[in-house]
């Protein structure tokens, strides 16, 4: 039986031009082209950081995993929002005769909002899939962050006052209503690293970053808002974007430009450990993740639904409008509506608020 590993990531523009960024942004918005001023802002951000190394780094990560596991698995690489696209790579895998595939998403934490965006593409009459849900607890990855933060504390902070700011990509606040495990995983991940470093609860905090402006509330505090709200600052901040493993725009701009600029304004020293990128400790974590999971059941993939079935709707949410295609809703919500029918999907309060904002609630 021919087996494969499919390593997947978010993607990035294929070329740093206005139209190249526009194409990528349109893919993120599910085929709806953003307004020109939105595209211009994102394009300017890419120019500010000199482009993005994400695709180069990811291909190097894939090659390093293949060097370790290539005798047992064919290793493939795909993006969610840029070439090579996941459906195209699955087509190539089918042509290569692959029958079983371990899906390794290059995001250590599991989120309905983001990870299910990968899962929806896993369709094949030939291939059975095994999706690794999360791998943030891998000891090698934890040790990477501990070692790199400790190095900054020892060599640069020394005896000065300091606070470690763990940040993670934010998610819409209605993820709380769905019981999304992502938020708790981020807190647990930060605590595990902090405990290994011997940090007290006053020496570190959790923030969120990189939220999208799609007209709905996101998990707070945003890292920039957190910095602005502090009445006193330490001598040093160490920013740890713990939900990412590779350098890309949400680290190189959101942290290294925006957070850095605020630190300059407040007279605080800015630090960020290098991202794992191609470090051997990250590769160890990825390889071990495959080893730990490879004997689990492979199956035709279907998105999980049981999380939603446990929700009890209030009277207010029972008559929400059936049509949702034009709303910026997570794909897993749309897919659930399509599969089970609008009348059978139990939506929590904040989903209702999304419909209200869009003026889509039916009249009483």
Curated annotation (Swiss-Prot):
The keyword Manganese does not apply. One of its GO terms (cellular component) is cytoplasm. Keywords: Cytoplasm, Heme biosynthesis, Iron, Lyase, Metal-binding, Porphyrin biosynthesis. GO terms for molecular function: ferrochelatase activity; metal ion binding. The keyword Iron applies. GO terms for biological process: heme biosynthetic process. Fe(2+) binds at residues 169, 250. It catalyses: Fe-coproporphyrin III + 2 H(+) = coproporphyrin III + Fe(2+). It is an enzyme of class 4 (lyase). Its EC number is 4.99.1.9. Coiled coil: none annotated. Fe-coproporphyrin III binds at residues 29, 118. Pathway: Porphyrin-containing compound metabolism; protoheme biosynthesis. It is found in: Cytoplasm. HAMAP family: Ferrochelatase (MF_00323). NCBIfam families: hemH. Belongs to the ferrochelatase family. PANTHER family: FERROCHELATASE, FERROCHELATASE, MITOCHONDRIAL. Involved in coproporphyrin-dependent heme b biosynthesis. Catalyzes the insertion of ferrous iron into coproporphyrin III to form Fe-coproporphyrin III. This is Coproporphyrin III ferrochelatase. It comes from Streptococcus pneumoniae (strain Hungary19A-6). The gene is cpfC.
């Amino acid at each position: 039986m021919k087996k494969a590993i499919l390593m997947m990531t978010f993607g990035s523009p294929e070329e740093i031009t206005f139209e190249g960024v526009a194409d990528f942004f349109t893919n993120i918005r599910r085929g709806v082209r953003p307004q020109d001023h939105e595209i211009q802002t994102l394009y300017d951000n890419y120019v500010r950081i000199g482009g993005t190394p994400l695709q180069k780094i990811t291909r190097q990560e894939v090659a390093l995993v293949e060097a370790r596991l290539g005798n047992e698995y064919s290793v493939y690489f795909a993006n969610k929002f840029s070439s090579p696209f996941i459906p195209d790579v699955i087509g190539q895998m089918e042509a290569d005769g692959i029958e079983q595939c371990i899906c390794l998403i290059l995001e250590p934490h599991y989120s309905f909002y983001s990870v299910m965006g990968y899962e929806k593409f896993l369709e094949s009459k030939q291939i059975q899939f095994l999706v690794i849900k999360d791998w943030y607890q891998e000891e090698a990855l934890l040790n990477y962050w501990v070692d790199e933060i400790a190095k900054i504390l020892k060599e640069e902070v020394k005896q000065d006052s300091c606070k470690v700011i763990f940040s993670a990509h934010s998610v819409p606040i209605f993820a709380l209503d769905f019981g999304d495990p992502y938020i708790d995983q981020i807190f647990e991940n930060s605590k595990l690293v902090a405990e290994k470093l011997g940090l007290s609860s006053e020496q570190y905090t959790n923030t969120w970053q990189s939220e999208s402006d799609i007209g709905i509330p996101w998990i707070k505090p945003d890292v920039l808002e957190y910095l602005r709200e502090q009445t006193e600052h330490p001598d040093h901040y160490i920013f740890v974007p713990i939900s990412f493993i590779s350098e890309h725009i949400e680290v190189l701009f959101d942290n290294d430009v925006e957070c850095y600029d605020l630190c300059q304004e407040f007279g605080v020293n800015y630090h960020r450990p290098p991202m794992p990128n191609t470090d051997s400790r990250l590769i160890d974590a990825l390889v071990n993740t495959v080893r730990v999971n490879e004997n689990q059941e492979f199956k035709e993939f279907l998105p999980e639904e049981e999380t939603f079935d446990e929700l009890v709707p209030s009277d207010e949410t029972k008559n929400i409008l059936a049509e949702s295609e034009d709303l910026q809703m997570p794909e897993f919500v749309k897919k659930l509506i399509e599969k089970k029918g609008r009348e059978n999907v139990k939506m929590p309060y904040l989903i209702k608020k999304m419909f209200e904002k869009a003026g889509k609630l039916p009249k009483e």
